[in-house]
From Swiss-Prot:
Keyword Cytoplasm: no
Organism superkingdom: Bacteria
Protein name, UniProt field: ATP-dependent Clp protease ATP-binding subunit ClpX
Keyword Protease found: no
CDD domains hit by this protein: RecA-like_ClpX
PANTHER family: ATP-DEPENDENT CLP PROTEASE ATP-BINDING SUBUNIT CLPX-LIKE, MITOCHONDRIAL, ATP-DEPENDENT CLP PROTEASE ATP-BINDING SUBUNIT CLPX-LIKE, MITOCHONDRIAL-RELATED
Taxonomy of the source species: Bacteria, Bacillati, Actinomycetota, Actinomycetes, Mycobacteriales
Described purpose of this protein according to its UniProt entry: ATP-dependent specificity component of the Clp protease. It directs the protease to specific substrates. Can perform chaperone functions in the absence of ClpP. Degrades anti-sigma-D factor RsdA when present in a complex with ClpP1 and ClpP2. Does not seem to act on anti-sigma-L factor RslA.
């Protein structure tokens, strides 16, 4: 029963038995009562069951062509990188499911090894964004780590296990879900050792970090401090198996193209030589011919390279691609700023030559797609400051002159309504 005592008025939860005074809220139903704590517990159970149901099944796993098509909606260009990533990600999650089925099968299982991904390419060309978009499509936990902050265990800096903590946090501390997530390690070229020969002195932020990453890249049972920071003997650890975690490591690898050119051979001189414009050279895939020996010469250790069998490279974006990035993707910058202005009741328009001028500036600055937002902020700052305080603006037009000559955008005044005209005449 829901009442305590023979004639008492004190109600209690029909499920946990706690009295009205022991809980925050008691909700009544036909002959029963339920407390807020039991409701929270029910919600947690339902969420866990739904999360288990949301696990990617092989028949539901998007095919490589579907993954590439999804990426096309968000990322402009980089077709080779999209294809490489689509195949690698599809095979990775297929491998996880093959492992689960293999445990239940009577046939002799074939163990499929993990294929982590190495992404090479200049800054601002979409490496991070490609990985983020992939994680969003697959609905798996995703974490980004910066390799420059990592040091070997026992030295000032972050331990490599802190990368895994970020993934666990992204999965809301659901370790089982985190164990099939994606970790993106950026700036990996900055942990290259200083020369291709093994160092006699300790290189704690270069070769030492590469050595520390080997085990978690390959797959190991790692102990992660729940609060981050350094390990100490008297704390509890979160245990996570990295066997099914997909690692995508990326970097700009400035100078690697020279190493590749030295190996491949310099282009010939004279009448028979191929002449290419600067624009063609800038957008060439310098890393298409990369070999493991080039990466070793750059400063990565052979064991580290061996754990990154899939190599995807991105190229510098040309003017046409940058213009498309501004206007075509689902969350394009132009669409974002149009929405911001709409919230103030003002229409925003960019002329075609204005978009080309913004792309030219990004190329001139050498910041790639990452620099587009900074340029647009500079261009729109004066009107974004004034417009919220004004009610006489209908439209703002950004032209080529606005971008190149730093002049104010064209402001189209709002026509007064009939009632406003009547008030003025009165």
């Amino acid at each position: 029963m829901a009442r305590i005592g023979d004639g008492g008025d004190l109600l209690k939860c029909s499920f946990c038995g706690k009295s009205q005074k022991q809980v925050k809220k008691l909700i009544a139903g036909p002959g029963v009562y339920i407390c807020d704590e039991c409701i929270d517990l029910c919600n947690e159970i339902i969420e866990e069951e739904l999360a288990d149901a949301d696990d990617v099944k092989l028949d539901e796993l998007p095919k490589p062509a579907e993954i590439r098509e999804f990426l096309e909606g968000y990322v402009i260009g980089q077709d080779t990188a999209k294809r490489t990533l689509a195949v690698a990600v599809y095979n990775h999650y297929k491998r996880i499911q093959a492992g689960e089925k293999g445990r239940d099968s009577r046939c002799e299982p074939v163990e499929l090894t993990k294929s982590n991904i190495l992404m090479l390419g200049p800054t601002g060309c979409g490496k991070t964004y490609l990985a983020q978009t992939l994680a969003k499509m697959l609905n798996v936990p995703f974490a980004i780590a910066d390799a420059t902050a990592l040091t070997e265990a026992g030295y000032v800096g972050e331990d490599v296990e802190n990368i895994l903590l970020k993934l666990i946090q992204a999965a809301d501390y659901d370790v089982k879900r985190a164990e099939t997530g994606i970790i993106y390690i950026d700036e990996v070229d900055k942990i290259a050792r200083k020369s291709e020969n093994p160092s006699i002195t300790r290189d704690v932020s270069g070769e030492g970090v590469q050595q520390a990453l080997l085990k978690i890249l390959e797959g190991t049972q790692a102990s992660v401090p729940p609060q981050g920071g350094r390990k100490h003997p008297h704390q509890e650890f979160i245990q996570i198996d990295t066997t099914n975690v997909l690692f995508i490591v990326a970097g700009a690898f400035a100078g690697l193209e020279k190493i590749i050119y030295e190996r491949v051979g310099k282009r010939g001189l004279g009448f028979g030589a191929e002449v290419r414009s600067k624009a063609e050279i800038d957008t060439t895939d310098h890393f298409a011919d990369v070999m493991p020996e080039d990466l070793i010469k750059f400063g990565l250790i052979p064991e580290f390279i061996g754990r990154l069998p899939v190599v995807a490279s991105v190229t510098n974006l040309d003017k046409e691609s940058l213009v498309k990035i501004l206007s075509e993707p689902k969350n394009a910058l132009v669409k974002q700023y149009i929405r911001l202005f709409e919230m103030d009741g003002v229409e925003l328009e960019f002329t075609d030559d204005a978009l080309e001028a913004i792309a030219d500036q990004a190329i001139h600055r050498g910041t790639g797609a990452r620099g587009l937002r900074a340029i647009m902020e500079e261009v729109l700052l004066p009107v974004m400051y004034d417009i919220p305080s004004r009610d006489d603006v209908a439209k703002v037009v950004v032209t080529k002159e606005t971008v190149q000559d730093n002049v104010l955008p064209t402001i189209v005044p709002r026509k007064p309504s009939r009632s406003e005209r009547r008030d003025k005449s009165a």
